[in-house]
Amino acid sequence: MPSFDIVSKVDMQEVDNAINQTVKEIAQRYDFKGSKCEVTLEKENIKVLADDDFKLKAVIDILQSKFIKRNISPKSLQYGKAEQASGSMVRQIITLQVGISKEKAKEIGQVIKETKLKVQSQIQDDQLRVTGKNIDDLQEVIRVLKGKDLDIDMQFVNFRS
C-alpha cells in the first residue's frame, strides 16, 4: 500500500550557520555598536540576550531573516516570554520545534479525516504515517495539509508506492 510520513525536522547545521551569521551581522551593524547582544545555541534552544526590548526585537528580526535565507521555516521556532536578565538586559529563549507532538499529530489526523479520502493515519512517536490504496488520495492529503495553517513546519518524506 502506498504511504508517506509527515515529520517536523530542522537541519541543525543550518540553524548553527544562521546563528553564526546573526552574530556576525550584530557585530557589524552600527546600531548595535557598544551593545552586549548575544545569540547562543544550546541543544534545541536559542538564547537571545539584548540590552533592551528594542534591541531584542531587532536581533530576533535578524535571526528570522537568516533562518528564512537558509530555508528554515519560521514555524519551527517557538518563542518564549521576554524576561529581565541581570542588570538592564533582556533575555528570550526560542525553542526549536523538532518532532510532532501527540496533540499536533491528533490535530493533523483530524484534518486528514475531514477530507473524507480513503486514507488512514497512524501516530508513530514524533511522526505521522499516512497510508492509502490510491497514490492520488495521498497527494490530495499532502495538498490539503500544505493549504492548512497548522502552526507547525511539516515535511513529507518516505513516499512509497
From Swiss-Prot:
Claim: rRNA-binding is one of the keywords in the record: no
GO molecular function (one): nucleotide binding
Annotated GO CC locations: cytosol
CDD domains: YajQ_like
Keywords of the record: Nucleotide-binding
Gene3D superfamilies: 3.30.70.860, YajQ-like, domain 2 (3.30.70.990)
Pfam families linked to this entry: DUF520 (PF04461)
Domain of life assignment: Bacteria
UniProt key word Glycoprotein: no
InterPro entries: DUF520 (IPR007551), UPF0234-like_C (IPR035571), UPF0234_N (IPR035570), YajQ-like_sf (IPR036183)
PANTHER family in alphabetical order: UPF0234 PROTEIN YAJQ
Family named by the database record: Belongs to the YajQ family.
Alphabetical list of NCBIfam families matching this protein: PRK05412.1
Function statement: Nucleotide-binding protein.
Protein name listed in UniProt: Nucleotide-binding protein Gbem_0619
Organism: Citrifermentans bemidjiense (strain ATCC BAA-1014 / DSM 16622 / JCM 12645 / Bem)
